[in-house]
Amino acid sequence: MGQDRGFGFPTQRLCSLSSLALSHLGKQDLNLVSKTCGDTTDMFSTRGSYQVSTQVSQSYFDGYCGWVHGSSHLQQQFLPPQNQCMKQVPLQVDGVISKAEEQCSQKRFLVFDQSGDQTTLLLASDIRKSFETLKQHACPDMKEELQRSNKDLFVCHGMQGNSEPDLKEDSEELNALLYSEDESGYCSEEDEVTSADHSPSIVVSGREDQKTFLGSYGQPLNAKKRKILETSNESMRDAESSCGSCDNTRISFLKRSKLSSNKIGEEKIFETVSLLRSVVPGEELVDPILVIDRAIDYLKSLKMEAKNREA
C-alpha cells in the first residue's frame, strides 16, 4: 500500500534502533511495534536491556522502499536531542548529591533560652553561633554576676598567701585605737576643759550618712571606727562602774564587819568590867584596869581562905 501510493511508514529494522539517541534513558525495557502499510503486518516485541550507544550514527539511504533511515520527525518530537540530555542530567544529579551531602554533614542544635521571663528557641548549625545570637538585654545581670564572681575568685586567690598579716594589721590598728581611747578616758575633766585644741569633736554634715568623727588631733575617722570606739567606751564605762560598785560593796562589808566585831568586843569588855565591879568590895572604880587588878587580888585572897579552912 505504501509502495503503490508512495507514502506511509516504512518497516523499521533493529539496525536503526541502535542509532537512536537514547542516552538519557540508559538501560530500559523496550517494547517496539512496527506496522507496515500493506496487508501483511510485521510486529515484533523486543524485551531486554541494551546498552545504548552515546554516539548517533549518520542517516543512510536504504534501497528498500526508497526511505532514508535516521531520526524521523516523530522520534525528534518524542525524544529530546542528545546534547540537552548530556548537559542537563549530570548537572541535576550533581546538584542533588551536593545538597544531600550538605544536609547530612550539617548538625543543628536546638537551644532553649530561658533567661528572664521569656523562653526562646534557637536553631543553629554551630553551638557557638546559637549562644552569640542570644538576646543581649535578656541576661545582662548574668554577665555582670559572672564578671564579679571571676574578680572575686581572682582576689581570693591573691589573698590566700597574705591573709594572716592583713588580719594582724587590723588587730593592731584596733588595739592602738582602744589604747588611745583608754588614755583619753583617764584624763581628768580639768585637762579636757583646758586643752580645747586636743579635745575630740564631732562634725555633722547636712546628711546623716556623711558624718565624720574627728579624733583628738583633728584626724577624721570613718563611721565604722567611730562605732567601734563608742562601743568600746561604753563597755569600759560599764566595766569600771561594775568594778567600782563591787569594790564599794566589799569595802562597806569589811567596814561593817570590823565595826560589828569592835562593837561586840567592846560590849563584852563592858559586861566583864561591870561584873567585876559588882564582885569586888569597896569603892566603885572608874578605870577598868584597876577594876581588873582589884578583882584578881580579891580572887587570890578567897583562894587562900579556902585552903586554910580545909586545913
Curated annotation (Swiss-Prot):
Main location: nucleus
Compartments, as annotated in UniProt: Nucleus
Keywords: DNA-binding, Nucleus, Transcription, Transcription regulation
GO molecular function terms noted in the UniProt entry: DNA binding; DNA-binding transcription factor activity; protein dimerization activity
InterPro entries in the record: bHLH_dom, SAC51-like
GO biological process, one term: regulation of DNA-templated transcription
bHLH domain sequence ranges: 253-302
GO CC annotation: nucleus
Superkingdom as given in the UniProt entry: Eukaryota
PANTHER family the UniProt entry points to: TRANSCRIPTION FACTOR BHLH145
Oligomer status and interactors: Homodimer.
Protein name: Transcription factor bHLH145
Species the sequence originates in: Arabidopsis thaliana
